[in-house]
Amino acid sequence: GDLNIAPLAEDVWSTKQLRNVVSHTDIERENLIAMQERGGWVDAVRDFFGADERLYSWWSYRARDYISSNRGRRLDHVWTSTDLAPQIQKVEIHSNTRGWKQPSDHVPISLQLG
């Protein structure tokens, strides 16, 4: 879902510059991670791609050069139960949709289970 929080350093283009910006503040990040842990949820996107890869699902409309600058944030999430997580076969962040005519600033994420 569109949670509008980027919990990890790898979920933003610059954790240093965005630390005090809404969507990446300490209180937002800590609370989202705590909610995920309390619910026993698995971050399907991170589970599939790994913790170290920079991943984004949002780019500002103000950045006309969003492709080359890649100053994005991962604000959209797919969580699964721990039982369902082993069935994740494919996760795609459809960044190409950001280039469509009149796109959203968020891009879809799809999950394939098997």
Give the ranges of each region predicted by the language model.
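Metal-dependent phosphoester-hydrolase catalytic domains
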Residues: 8-114
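Active-site flanking residues adjacent to catalytic metal/cofactor-binding acidic residues
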Residues: 1-3
